[in-house]
UniProtKB/Swiss-Prot annotation:
One of its GO terms (cellular component) is cytosolic small ribosomal subunit. This is Small ribosomal subunit protein uS17. InterPro entries: NA-bd_OB-fold (IPR012340), Ribosomal_uS17 (IPR000266), Ribosomal_uS17_bact/chlr (IPR019984), Ribosomal_uS17_CS (IPR019979). GO terms for molecular function: rRNA binding; structural constituent of ribosome. Part of the 30S ribosomal subunit.
Length: 86
């Protein structure tokens, strides 16, 4: 009897730091509309993601996916690098 995994979030963002071992910091930008005034506001959040091969560099556009807790602050993992930094 195999259990199916639940829905896992995936996000796109830019790598802001890769100085930690097997860890990258990804800046995720989200656009939300203000409830009263309707203006579109950019909200950003920074998350730590697991990078097994330490292949992502600063400025890379990456796809990350939610996963089980890897450490005290890591709950995301690197899926693929969408665009390398220039």
């Amino acid at each position: 009897m195999s259990q199916q995994r639940g829905y896992r979030k995936s996000r796109r963002g830019y790598v802001t730091s890769n100085s930690m071992d097997k860890t990258i910091v990804v800046k995720i930008e989200d656009r939300v509309k203000h409830a009263l005034y309707g203006k579109v506001i950019r909200k950003t959040s920074k998350v730590k993601a697991h990078d097994q091969g330490s292949i992502a560099g600063v400025g890379d556009l990456v796809l990350i996916s939610e996963t089980r807790p890897i450490s005290a602050t890591k709950r995301w993992r690197l899926v693929q690098i969408l665009e390398k930094a220039k």
